[in-house]
């Protein structure tokens, strides 16, 4: 008999793949990025510090540890009985594994289809609003966003894209479709995945390497803390991966901790398999603990 955790993960992945395979067109339905059960141990109280200790129940602790090793500000100290013990900073950043990112993060893909007319219109609107930050090279008699160069501070450009997409999507929804960038550009609606694919499309159209990261975000406000399945971006700017999160733009005053599960590297027709990995590697439960608990 399968362990209950295994049964739950298999059922979720089966549902995910079935929905993706059965839904035609450019907008596929996926299961809800759920709220993940999170508790505070008796020795922990709010407000949380900039670095916190977590006990995270996961399906495959060794694999999840290898994924988390791609970011600094997250330290895995061990695991036991499917519970990963780690510390995480609210200033977590990706580790640069090369002087420049893989060309795939500039590609026009099935998911981040920035060469579609609807996305080009969004990019043009961005340039009209923030054109001073971008120089577009001339290719023949036309202007190519694909060969654009950054004129201003790289971090400033990332922040401008983040703010622009946050305001461009006028109908935030929780129906949890996984729509491609061109669909989001037309509908101007969606949840965190839609914000992420459109942000990635705008960045790539401006020759900024961009990728989508899927994982969990722990959000604290004045009186509570919760963990939610989430998607965000990382842009390659000034030799570093910088986190961009248009979906959480309005929540800037809140304290946030990002716990990645998967980088969406497969953006082709088989992208659903990548999403299934994200589901499999997602936390089942999270407990914020103290040194006394360990």
Description of each model-found segment:
Residues 161, 189-217, 233:
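Cysteine-centered nucleophilic/redox motifs
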């Amino acid at each position: 008999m399968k362990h209950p955790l295994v049964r739950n993960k298999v059922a979720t992945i089966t549902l995910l793949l079935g929905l993706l395979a059965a839904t035609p067109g450019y907008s596929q339905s996926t299961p809800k990025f759920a709220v993940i059960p999170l508790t505070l141990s008796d020795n922990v109280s709010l407000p949380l510090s900039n670095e916190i200790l977590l006990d995270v129940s996961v399906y495959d602790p060794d694999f999840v540890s290898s994924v988390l090793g791609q970011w600094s500000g997250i330290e895995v100290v061990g695991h036991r009985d499917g519970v990963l013990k780690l510390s995480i900073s609210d200033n977590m950043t990706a580790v640069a594994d090369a002087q420049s990112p893989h060309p795939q993060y500039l590609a026009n893909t099935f998911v981040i289809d920035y060469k579609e007319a609807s996305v080009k219109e969004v990019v043009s609107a961005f340039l009209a609003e923030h054109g001073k930050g971008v120089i577009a090279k001339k290719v023949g008699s036309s202007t190519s966003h694909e060969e654009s160069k950054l004129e201003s501070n790289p971090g400033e450009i990332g922040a401008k894209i983040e703010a622009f997409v946050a305001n461009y999507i006028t109908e935030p929804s929780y129906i949890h479709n996984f729509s491609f960038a061109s669909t989001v550009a037309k509908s101007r609606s969606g949840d965190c995945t839609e914000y992420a694919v459109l942000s990635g499309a705008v960045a790539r159209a401006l020759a900024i390497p961009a990728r989508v990261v899927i994982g969990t975000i722990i959000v604290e406000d004045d009186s509570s803390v919760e963990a939610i399945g989430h998607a965000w971006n990382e842009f390659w700017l000034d030799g570093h991966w910088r986190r961009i999160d248009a979906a959480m733009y309005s929540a800037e005053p809140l304290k946030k901790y990002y716990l990645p599960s998967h980088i969406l590297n497969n953006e082709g027709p088989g992208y659903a398999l990548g999403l299934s990995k994200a589901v499999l590697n997602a936390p089942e439960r999270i407990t914020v603990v103290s040194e006394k608990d360990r």
